[in-house]
Amino acid sequence: MRNILAPVLSLVLIAGVASPALAASGPFFSLKNTDFVVTIAFLVFIAVLFYFKVPSMIGGALDKRAEGIQSDLDEARKLREEAQSLLASFERKQKEMQGQADAIVAAAKEEAQRSAEQAKVDLEASIARRLAAAQDQIASAEAAAVKDVRDRAIAIAVAAAGDVIASSMTAAEANKLIDAGIADAGAKLH
């Protein structure tokens, strides 16, 4: 401390002796000279600061502050790196999920297309079956109508023939026909 105090004191004294204030006023080394008193007070203040090691305390505090800032920076750097790795991981997962979603959508579209085609084929087959059933019903109804018409025509023809035969045939001819029918039936049965 004395090593620093002596050169500082000598510099202050030289600066004080060479100052223009000394040339303008009376003797510099007098307690009546305010410049001298201020200089002495300043030197005493500096000496007290050095005696109580205030510069080293300030330096230590600044060093601690610098270390704290450096540790904060290191922690922030680590957090930033972790955040970047998490971001990269999430981006990879998002790309994977997007790929899976695209694949699911493509599969669903493909399945929907196949289902639509199958439904179309099934609908065409159903229409063909219904058309065939309708045609069968029409043919059956037509056949039934034709049979009904034939049966009525036969019944009308038999009734008309019976009327014609009954009106034109005599009782002897009718008995002769009945006997021939019985004989014919008997021959066919035996």
UniProtKB/Swiss-Prot annotation:
Q: Does the keyword Flavoprotein apply?
A: no
List the cysteine pairs that form cystine.
Answer: none
- Provide the alphabetized UniProt keywords: ATP synthesis, Cell inner membrane, Cell membrane, CF(0), Hydrogen ion transport, Ion transport, Membrane, Transmembrane, Transmembrane helix, Transport
Tell me the compartments it is located in.
Cell inner membrane
Recorded GO cellular component terms are: plasma membrane; proton-transporting ATP synthase complex
Q: What is its main location?
A: membrane
Q: Name one GO molecular function term.
A: proton-transporting ATP synthase activity, rotational mechanism
Q: Which InterPro entries match?
A: ATP_synth_b/b'su_bac/chlpt, ATP_synthase_B_chain
Which topology term describes how it sits in the membrane? Single-pass membrane protein
List where the protein spans the membrane: 4-24
Record function comment: F(1)F(0) ATP synthase produces ATP from ADP in the presence of a proton or sodium gradient. F-type ATPases consist of two structural domains, F(1) containing the extramembraneous catalytic core and F(0) containing the membrane proton channel, linked together by a central stalk and a peripheral stalk. During catalysis, ATP synthesis in the catalytic domain of F(1) is coupled via a rotary mechanism of the central stalk subunits to proton translocation.
> What HAMAP family does the entry give?
ATP_synth_b_bprime
Q: How does it assemble?
A: F-type ATPases have 2 components, F(1) - the catalytic core - and F(0) - the membrane proton channel. F(1) has five subunits: alpha(3), beta(3), gamma(1), delta(1), epsilon(1). F(0) has three main subunits: a(1), b(2) and c(10-14). The alpha and beta chains form an alternating ring which encloses part of the gamma chain. F(1) is attached to F(0) by a central stalk formed by the gamma and epsilon chains, while a peripheral stalk is formed by the delta and b chains.
UniProt family annotation: Belongs to the ATPase B chain family.
User: Which protein is depicted?
Assistant: ATP synthase subunit b
